[in-house]
Amino acid sequence: MRESGTLFQRFCFAQASFESSRHVYRREHGPGQVRRFFNTSFTAFELRRYMMNFYFIKGSFTITELVEVSEFSRPTVTSTVHEALELGYLEELSGTGDRRRRDFRPTEPMLEAWRNYCNALLANPEFSRVLKLAQALMSMRELEAQPSGNDV
């Protein structure tokens, strides 16, 4: 248990270091309007993560879904989505049948910005270190959770 605690401390440190080094993405990938929009506020930055998660899981998202997972207020989420929509980073899907349910998905510029972000992560040695520590921690916790054969 002590080893996993020490490893967890190292993981927390590495993750904090990685999270504070987002400048790597900014430096390695030229200026882009999408990145600027989503990095201008904490709300927009966090919502982008949820938008992309829903996009890769099911192809689209609604404002209600973003409100539920983000715990931001509906007006805040709605404002951010509509601003991204006006700037052309999101598009509204048509043909859902229910006028109350509005589905959105990222446009190609936003998807390209996300791919650039992911490429920057993979090029960042700190990200690789954090990922390896996380994998080691998960394996150790799985082993610790398994009942010992000697307890019979």
Put a short name on every predicted segment.
Residues 1-38:
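N-terminal leader segment of winged-helix/HTH proteins
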Residues 50-54:
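Short amphipathic alpha-helical elements of helix-turn-helix/winged-helix folds
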Residues 57-68:
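Short acidic, hydrophobic short linear motifs in intrinsically disordered regions
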Residues 86-96:
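A short, conserved structural fragment
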